[in-house]
Amino acid sequence: MAQVINTNSLSLLTQNNLNKSQSALGTAIERLSSGLRINSAKDDAAGQAIANRFTANIKGLTQASRNANDGISIAQTTEGALNEINNNLQRVRELAVQSANSTNSQSDLDSIQAEITQRLNEIDRVSGQTQFNGVKVLAQDNTLTIQVGANDGETIDIDLKQINSQTLGLDSLNVQKAYDVKDTAVTTKAYANNGTTLDVSGLDDAAIKAATGGTNGTASVTGGAVKFDADNNKYFVTIGGFTGADAAKNGDYEVNVATDGTVTLAAGATKTTMPAGATTKTEVQELKDTPAVVSADAKNALIAGGVDATDANGAELVKMSYTDKNGKTIEGGYALKAGDKYYAADYDEATGAIKAKTTSYTAADGTTKTAANQLGGVDGKTEVVTIDGKTYNASKAAGHDFKAQPELAEAAAKTTENPLQKIDAALAQVDALRSDLGAVQNRFNSAITNLGNTVNNLSEARSRIEDSDYATEVSNMSRAQILQQAGTSVLAQANQVPQNVLSLLR
């Protein structure tokens, strides 16, 4: 080996080994201080990617476990509200059993019904106000999806149902004794002013078109004559002047005659056939037998009130009265009877004018329409029958944009048939939902247990890849420290080797 002083190869070799031991010492200290075997991707590129996927899965499962606990909480909140509803239903059933006893007086039944109504109102309040984190759990049918896994589609659904007196079928529950409804046909001398001259001046073109719906031509009463059918006690006129598409509207129409001789054409009038025996009349006919005229006026009044013309056929004016459990007769007002249905009405005994009581409401298209007030519907209470055929209880009118009317009062309460059966069905409905909520809580508990086990196993697997083995790292640190000390000492010796060349220069 040549003796040189410009390059000290032994010193360079010693420095290189010293750097290696210093790097090993730094790595060992970093791992011991952080607790991690992988502090950056350079420590273990593949291991870092695997450990990161484990971390994402572990964090997702941990959050899923918290979600499942939220699911349990909302199910418990809902089930607690249902328990209160169940308590109210049990009391309602108890009261219904009490009401079935014939020893109860009418006042007893009224008191029982009052408490039942309050209990049902409380059920509605609980249904409308119970919420979890802003979600009303019983106010409407709803499905809540709870994420119980770290990946898409790993969910459990909570099916919530609207539970109130209406969905339970108890909104019209009534245990009061039914009233016996009676009606007495009203017979009146509709036109008493015999000799009054008939006046058709009101049946001008505008009035006729408004009543018949025609628009083409100039309509008028042919000859200005009114004809009277003595057999049916009806008045008729012949209308002409319609042209074009409305020419078919020319013909005979039945008209109404007031006591002052005024002749009017009912709204929605349709063409009819005048009896062959009808004769021209210039004066009001005094009628001795008036039911047919009353019936015609009643029909027209119902049609004006929004009732279908077919349903209004055969309508008659009747006086209503009710007999309670104690045999007391309660006089009611007038009604228009059409088949087995009754509609509230006003009747002017002086003039014979008949008018159906109506309620205005806003239809789905935003237009204001008129509906007749039907008495004694399926639940025994006043109902509103709209022009589109839908029927609403008066008590629910506010929910359908009806304008309040004093006529919408309870007419005749009808006792609910088989009330205990209806209440039992309601209890079964509540029990079914409570069972579903109990079952889903058990599912959540099972999911939480499984999530915990999975998180533990994944954490152990990640630890084997990512965490420091302190026994190994302490050993590595000790070895590196010894090598550092030895390397430093040897480097000092190696740096002295070039001085040997000086002995050759002496």
Swiss-Prot record:
- Which InterPro entries does its entry note? Flagellin (IPR001492), Flagellin_C (IPR046358), Flagellin_C_sub2 (IPR042187), Flagellin_D3 (IPR014981), Flagellin_N (IPR001029), FLIC_barrel (IPR049365)
The yes or no answer to whether the keyword Manganese is present is no
| Compartments (UniProt record) | Secreted; Bacterial flagellum
Gene Ontology cellular-component annotations = bacterial-type flagellum; extracellular region
Domain of life according to the entry: Bacteria
Pfam families linked to this entry: Flagellin_C, Flagellin_D3, Flagellin_N, FLIC_barrel
- List keywords of the entry alphabetically: Bacterial flagellum, Secreted
Instruction: Extract the Gene3D superfamilies matched here.
Output: 6.10.280.190, f41 fragment of flagellin, C-terminal domain, f41 fragment of flagellin, middle domain, f41 fragment of flagellin, N-terminal domain, Flagellar export chaperone, C-terminal domain
A Gene Ontology MF term for this entry? structural molecule activity
Is the keyword Secreted in the record? yes
What does the sequence similarity comment in the record state about its family? Belongs to the bacterial flagellin family.
Q: Which PANTHER family match?
A: FLAGELLIN
Q: Which NCBIfam families match?
A: PRK08026.1
Other facts noted in the record for this chain? Individual Salmonella serotypes usually alternate between the production of 2 antigenic forms of flagella, termed phase 1 and phase 2, each specified by separate structural genes.
Task performed by this protein: Flagellin is the subunit protein which polymerizes to form the filaments of bacterial flagella.
- By what name is this protein known? Phase 2 flagellin
Organism, as annotated: Salmonella typhimurium (strain LT2 / SGSC1412 / ATCC 700720)
The taxonomy runs: Bacteria, Pseudomonadati, Pseudomonadota, Gammaproteobacteria, Enterobacterales
Q: Which gene encodes it?
A: fljB
